[in-house]
Amino acid sequence: MAQQPLSSSAQPTDIYGGDEVSALVLDPGYCSTRAGFAGEDVPKSILPSFYGHVTGDNSRDLFGDECLIPRENYEVRNYMNKDSVVEDWDVAARIWENMLVNRLQPERQTPPSKNGLNDDPRPEGQDGEGDVAMDDAEAESMEKPLGENPLLVTEAPWNTPKAREKAIEIIMENWGCPAFWMSRTPVLAAFAAGKATSLVIDVGGANTSVTAIHDGMVLKRSIQKSPVGGIWLSSQIRSLFETSEPQVELTPTFMIENKTPVDALSSPSVRLRNFPYSITDSFRAYEEERVLTEFKESVVEVWRGPGRYSVPGNEEFVKTQPGRVFEMPDGYNQMWREQRFRVTEGMWDENAGYPIPEADRLNKTQTIPELIRAALNAVDVDLRGNLLANVVVTGSTSLINGFNDRLNTELMAMYPGLKIKIHAAGLTSERRFGAWIGGSILASLGTFHQMWISRKEYEENGPNVVEKRCK
């Protein structure tokens, strides 16, 4: 049973007194990490979760825009795995601290005892009017980077107890936060949409998850996840380029020295840069992913229906419709018509996508309709109608044109007798940052103050308190 919050009269007033709390919200993901102040509309600080590592004698790590500059002996890595669970805690702590402290906090003032303004030249033992004494506890609190900021951190619904305990340990021990909370991303996305009960479909960069939320709690048996996300779509686009006639060369922007405009389908007229060192595969793949992301955002579309895209006649119909032109970094450009629909079709029909390596291929249970079916089959029959009337769509990959229309078509075909209502934020930022916005709302509520895990509670119970409190 979850621990009951203290009554408001018993709350420590230094943390819980009043509605004004300078709380921070941190939302780590596989593709990017978001951070900002509770109560604001969007995160103030957004950094890639990828970082650069220079090997050799001058070994070091590089974050943010520094990752985009090619270097010798330079690898691009990620501190998370594709399940959105932290793997490299040393790097994670450094990235998070950089975002929460260096980017969000004002420069800290030097303590009066150390700024030299109160030094008194008189001999020891004589009182000096300007002397300022500071006890050890006060000095320590001044040195902790987040000593005045409660912190709410989001997590994937399948996050491990070990990872949760490691997070609170870093935040309390290293940063000195006065209070902490950890909340699952589907719950926060539902809060951002104003729903306490909902079916949350989160289509992110590394994976897609479907989770049933009832009265603000995750129904754990309903949690379903699949690798069908933005990275998987990128593998479909690579396959499209490789099987096109003519074959499309994927040359990342950093390799282009100059280019000349050419007609559609003509070979590119480009001069490539020469580097005095070899470019690593990981850096090239990272730069190629940026081009593929641009292609996804501007060209790729989801077939809305009726029926599946593979139904005879649908592809012929699409060929008669206006296409979209995309220019590659090297200047090659082409009109894309039916191909841009087939790229996303594998999300809904495992047999309809482009051929990709066996390791990345989806089976039927990993498609979005089957994830939804499995999630709903795992919950009580009486809840299903309420969940389908409150479907919340979030995640940046859900912004692909036509996604919500196709989702509605699939749900109506699967559950013809039930009312289907999809809630998807219209603003791009609200869809991309749904979990962060939910955390921002939650951490800024006066009624939530009594829920924080205080520093005193952490010191009494240890890191395991996060498992007991954050259900």
Curated annotation (Swiss-Prot):
User: Where is composition skewed (Polar residues) in this entry?
Assistant: 107-116
**Major subcellular site:** nucleus
Region: Disordered, residue numbers? 103-132
Tell me the domain of life: Eukaryota
**An individual GO BP term:** DNA repair
- In its keyword annotation, does this UniProt entry include Transcription? yes
Q: Give the stretches traversing the membrane.
A: none
- Tell me where it resides: Nucleus
Q: Which Pfam families does this UniProt record tie to the protein? A: Actin
**Keyword GTP-binding (UniProt):** no
One GO location term (cellular component): nucleus
- Could you tell me which InterPro entries the record lists for this protein? Actin, Actin_CS, ATPase_NBD
Quote the PANTHER family the UniProt record gives.
ACTIN
Sum up the protein's function in the record's words: Chromatin interaction component of the NuA4 histone acetyltransferase complex which is involved in transcriptional activation of selected genes principally by acetylation of nucleosomal histone H4 and H2A. The NuA4 complex is also involved in DNA repair. Is required for NuA4 complex integrity. Component of the SWR1 complex which mediates the ATP-dependent exchange of histone H2A for the H2A variant HZT1 leading to transcriptional regulation of selected genes by chromatin remodeling. Component of the INO80 complex which remodels chromatin by shifting nucleosomes and is involved in DNA repair.
User: Can you tell me which family this protein belongs to?
Assistant: Belongs to the actin family. ARP4 subfamily.
Q: How does it assemble?
A: Component of the NuA4 histone acetyltransferase complex, of the INO80 chromatin remodeling complex, and of the SWR1 chromatin remodeling complex.
The protein's name = Actin-related protein 4
Origin species? Gibberella zeae (strain ATCC MYA-4620 / CBS 123657 / FGSC 9075 / NRRL 31084 / PH-1) (Wheat head blight fungus)
Q: Which gene encodes it?
A: ARP4
